[in-house]
Amino acid sequence: MKGNRNPPPPPSGPVPPSPTSKNTAKYTNKDGSKFITVPKMNTPIDSAQPSPTASSLAAKPALPPGPETEPPQTVNRKKQKRRAKAAAKAAAERAQNSPAINGLPSPSPTNDQQSADADPEDDEDEPGTGHDSGNQSLYLNGGAHGGAPGKSKKSKKKKKKNATGPAGGFPNNNPYAQDDRDHSPEPILPPPPPQQNRPGMSREKIWNTNSQEERERIKEFWLGLSEAERKSLVKVEKDAVLKKMKEQQKHTCSCTVCGRKRTAIEEELEGLYDAYYEELEQYANHPNQGEGPPMLRPRRSFGSMGGMRPRGLHSRFSNHQPSRGRIVDELEGDEEEEEVEAEAEDDGEGDEEGEDVYSEDELEDDMYSEEEQEPSEELHRSDYAADFFNFGNSLTVQGRDRLPILPSFLQNYPFSGTGNNAYGSSSLGGILTVADDLLKNDGKKFIEMMEQLAERRMAREEDARGQFERAYDHPNGERYVHSHPPPPDEEEFEDEEEEYEEDDEEEYNSPDEEDTMTEEQRMEEGRRMFQIFAARMFEQRVLTAYREKVAKERQAKLLEEIEAENQQDAQRKAKKAKDAQRRKDRAAKKKEAQAEEKARREAEKAAEEAARRAEEARKAEEQRAKAEEKRKKKEAQRKAEEEERQRKEAERLRKIQDREEAERKAREAREREKKTREEARLREKEAREQKERKDRERREQQERERREKEAKAKAEREAKEAKEAKEAKEGKDTKERRKKEERAAHKAAALAPAIPVPITLPKRSATQQPPAPPVAPVPVLPQQSTSYASPKVPVATPALPKAPTPMRARQTSQQDGSTASSGAASNSGSMASQNPSPHPITPVHASPGLMAPPSKSGVMGIGSQGSAQPPSHSASPMSFPAKLLPPQHSPFGIPPMGSAMSYPPPGLSQMPLGFANPLHREPLFPPMPGFRPASGMMPMPPGLNGPGVNRGFPLHPPPGFLGGPMESPAPSMAQAMSPGLQRDNQSPHSRQGSGSFDPSQPISRPTPIGRPASVVQGQRPSNWSPSSGPPKPEPEAHLGSRALLDDLDDGPQDFPGRLSRGGSAPGPRPAPGFPMPPFGMDPMFSHNPWAPPGVVQPNLFGPHPPPSFSPLSAHTPMGMPWGHAMPSASTFGTPGAVDRPIEPRSVAVRKMLRRACEDLANAGSAEGRDSFIPLEMIKVQVENFNHGYPIDEKDLLDICETEGNEVNGGGSFDVVNDGQGGRSIRFVSGDQRTAPQPVQLAVGYNPGSPIGGGR
C-alpha cells in the first residue's frame, strides 16, 4: 500500500536454509511434489524484500504457497551484498577449476538438471499459471555487480511495483524486456526439482539435448559450419532488431526527449552487438581458449552504462550514481514460476514451429495492471545505467553449459549466484522465448516491451519527482504536466539524495558503508550481461539450425522407411496376387474340364435330340403329304361341286330369265289384249252413255218442267202458309231456311260433275219427286242388316232432309225396270256421300262402302249410280253389271270362306287371279282408298275398326312420314280390291264427315258455304285423272321433326328399296299372315291406330294389296312380282314360318356380299382369301342367296363403300379395276369383325332386288 514501508511478508517464498547446512537452501514445488537443494550462496535471501502492494496483488493474484514455504529471514542488506559478491567469485573459481565433461563446464547440481527436465505438462496440470508459461523472474541489479550506494525501503518498494521497467532511462527496445513487463507482479520461483522425461520427449528424442551424443552432434554440426554460415546465424539479430525498432517508432512521440531515447537505444544496441561480434569472432579464431573471459576494452557505446551521460541526456541523470542495492521482485510463488519457466523452455524446444508463449492480450493485461498501480512514495534512485543493468538482470539466461558451442569466457563465466536471482538459474524458456520472438515474429513484441518500459520508466520518474516535491515542499511549487520535466538543479538533487540516503541508513540501522562499484566494473558487468544474452540468442539459432538439419534427416529417413514399407506391401500384395492367380488358374482348369465334360454330354444329348427330331420331321412330312393330298382331292371335289353348282345356278338363272321373258311377253300380250278390249268397251260405253245422256236430258227436261210447276204451286201454298205463321215461326223458319240452303249447297256440290261439261238438265215431273214436308223430321239411322254384328252402339245423328237437287243421276240401263222409292232413297243417300269434300275444286273420288244389305229386288246395294260422263275415267271407277249373282248367305251375312273369290270382283271378271295382265300394271283406275276383305276373310262389320265412319279410305301418314295412296307399289290392286266402289252405306244422311282428306276438285258452281281444301303432306292428285290435268311438281314440305333436319340428313334417297327414316312406329308387330292395315285403320280386333307395321315395306302408310297377296314380309322374296304365289303365306291361317328380326335391306345385302366373298375365297375360285374376286361372280353368288332375283352391280359397289360395324357384318371391301373395264372386290376382315348372320332361306326372306325397288 501507499506509504507502507514495512508491509507484511509475502505468503510464499523460498524455504530458508536449514540450521544444519548453512550453505544450502531447499526449494519445493507448490504442491510439494518436487524439491531441490542448492548452495546457499546461489540463493541469497534479501531480508528487505518488500511485499507486493494491493494493486499489484489485484492485478496478478499470488499463487498459493507451497507446503514448506516460510517467510524469508531479514538480513542486513549490505552484508548480503558482500556475501553474494564473494560467493560469485568463489563460484567462478570453481567453474574454472572443475573438469569439463566433453568440453563442457560442469553444470550446477540444480540448473542443468532443471533445464534438462523442464516439465512441459505443468501448464496443463496447473491452469492457473498456464498463460504465464513463458514468464521469467525479474533479476535486478544486486550486490554482486558493484558497490553502488544502497537504496531505501521506499525505493525498493517502488522497484517492486514497477519491476517490469528499468529505473534508468534505457528505452524499451531490449528484446528481453518483455519478461519484465508481462510478469512484473509474479514472484520469483525457485528452480523446480529434477523430473523424469515426459512421454512426448521420449517419443521425439530428436529435440532432446541432454544426452552426450546429442551434444556431440551439435558440436560437430557447429564445427562443420563454415565462417560465412556461422556469421549468417548471428548477423541477423542486429539488423532485424534495429529495423523493427525503427518501424515501430515511426509513429511515436517526436519530442526531443523521446528522440534522445530512441537514439540512445539504437546506439546502445549497436554497440553491444558490435562488441559481442568482435568477441565471438575472436572466440572463433581461438576456440580452445578456456582461461577466463577476455576483457575487451570499453567502447564508446558503453558509456551510458558506466554512469556517463548519453548524448542529449540531462546532467542530473548522468551525475547520479547508480545504487548498489538491487530491486528484488516478489518472492511469492517462486517455485511455480520456476516450473512455468521450465515448461516454457521445453515447449520452445519440443515444438518445431516455435510457438510463441507471449500473447498480445497478456502483454496488454500486464501493462494495464502495472500502469494502474498507484506510485509509491519512495523515490527511484536509479539512473539510466542502473536501469540498463536491471534490464540485463531481467534477461533470463539459463543453461550456459547446454551447448558446447559457446565461447569459453561464457562457459566459465563465474556468476554471482545460481539461485533465484542468478542469471543462469531460471528456466531457459524465457531467453529462448524471446529469441523465438526475434526469429519468428521479427522482434515485434520485444520492441513493444522496450517501448512500454521506457514510457513507464519516464512516468515513474515524473511521479517520483512529484511525490518528492510534495513530501519535501518543493521551493518553487511548480508542477509539470509533460512527461519530460526540466531537469532540477544539481544542488537540489544533491540535497534530496542526501536526505534519502539518511533515510536509508536510519531505516536499515546498518552502520556499514555501502560498497561502491567502479565505472569499469559496471561496464564489464553490462558487457557480460549482453554477451550472455547474445550467446543465448546465438545458441538458439544454432540449435534451431541443428534441429532443422536433424528434421530433414529424419524426414528423409522416414521417407526411406515409408518407401521400404511400400515396397514390402507391394511385394506382399504381389505375392498375394500371384497366389490368387494360381488359385484362379487351378479353378479355371477345373471349370474348363467340367465345361468340356458338360459339352460332351450336351453334344451327345443334342445328337440324340437331332435324330429324334429328324424322325419326327419325317413323320410330320409324311402326314403333311397325306393331308396335302387329301386336301387337294377335297379341293378338286369341291371345285367340281362348285362348278356343277354354278352350272346349275347359271342354268336356273337362264331358266328364270327365260321364264321372266316369257312372262313379260305374255304379260305384254295380255296387256295389249286387255287394252284393246278396254278400248272397245270404252267406245261402246261412250256410245251407250251418249244415248243415255240424251234420254236423260229429255227426261230431266220433262222432270224439270214438272218440278217447276209443282214448285210454283208449292211456293204459292208455302207463301200463304208462311204469311200466316210468319210471326210465330219466324225464327224457326229462318233457321230451317239456313239449313235448307246448307243442304242444297251440299247436294249441289255432290251432284256437280267432275268435268264442267255443259249439259241440259231436263225437268223432272212432279210425280217423280215427293213434296218436301214443311218441317224436316229428324231421321234415324237406316236399318242395318241383321247379318252384320256391330260391336258398337248406334248413335242417332240428327240430319235435315235433303234439299231438292237440280240434277238427278240417271239409272243405268242394266237395272231392273222397277225403281222403288226405297232404292231411290238409298241411291240418293249414297250419292250424297260421294263428295265428302264441300270444296268445289275437289275431285270426286269413289266413296267405298260396305256391302249393302239385299234390296227388295234381291240385288246387293253396292252402289248403282250410273255414269253419264265421257270415257275419261270420272268419279265412277268402273261399271258393274246390273244384275249380280245372288249372295250366298251365311251367319252374320259373311260370305263363306273361299267363296268370296270364286268369282272376280264386279267389273273385273276378265282378270286373272294373279292380276298379271298388263292392264293392271298401268294406273287404269284412280286409286281407291277403300278396303275390301280378301277371300276367306271375315269382312269388317260396320263400326268394327274398319275404315271408319264416313271414311272409305286410309288415313294419310302424319307429317314427315313418307307414303300414301299414291305411293302404293300396286295402285291398280288397291283400286281393284276396294270393296265399296259406289256408296258409303254406313250413313243414311248426307252430312259430310269431318276430317275428310280428299284431293281438291276442279272449279265448279259457287256454293253458299265452302271449306278450304285440306292439304296433306304426301297426297297428290291422280296423275292420270283428266280432271286434274298433267301432274305438277310439288316441293316436298318438311313438317314435324323433319323440318329440323338438313336435306342431306335423310341419307341416300336414290337407293332402290331403301326404307325411309322413321318407317317403323313403336309397338308390337302383327302376326304373320295378317295384312298390314293402312295408316289410320286399326287392325282387326285392335284399337291401336298407331299399331306398328309387321314387316318392313317401302310404302308404310299407303293402301295394301289384298290379304291373299301378302305384303313384303319375311316370307316374300325381295322383288317378287305380285302375281306369283307366296311360298307359304296363308290368308288367314297359321304363318308359314317363324318370324325373324327384320333388318334394313342395305344391311342384308352387305351381309350377303360378305358371305359371297368369303365363300368364293374359300372355294378356291380365287387364288386365296386375300385375292380379288370378279364382280360378276360375286353378283351371281348374291343373287343365288336372293333366290335368283337380280341385284344391280352399281348397288353392290355402293354397298362396298359403306363402313363395317357390328350390325352390318363388319370389315371392309376393297374395289379395284382389272384394266378391262371390270371390277374386282376383296373383303378385308376388321379388328371387331362379327360373325356373319346367315340368311334363313327356310322362311323365304330376302331383302329384295334393287332393280325391283322392293316391290
UniProtKB/Swiss-Prot annotation:
Biased composition (Basic residues): 76-86, 151-162
Pro residues bias spans: 1-19, 187-196, 770-780, 1067-1080
Primary site of residence: cytoplasm
Listed Acidic residues bias regions: 118-127, 330-376, 488-518
Coiled coil (residue ranges): 547-745
GO cellular component entries: cytoplasm
Compartment list: Cytoplasm
Region (Disordered): 1-214, 285-379, 470-525, 563-898, 956-1080
Keyword Coiled coil set for record: yes
Ranges of biased composition (kind: Basic and acidic residues): 201-214, 470-481, 590-630, 637-745
UniProt keyword Transport present: no
Keywords carried by this UniProt record: Coiled coil, Cytoplasm, Stress response
Bias-annotated ranges (Polar residues): 865-877, 983-1004
Biased composition (Low complexity): 50-61, 87-96, 811-835
Listed Pfam families: NST1
Protein family membership: Belongs to the NST1 family.
Main function: May act as a negative regulator of salt tolerance.
Designated name of the protein: Stress response protein NST1
Gene: NST1
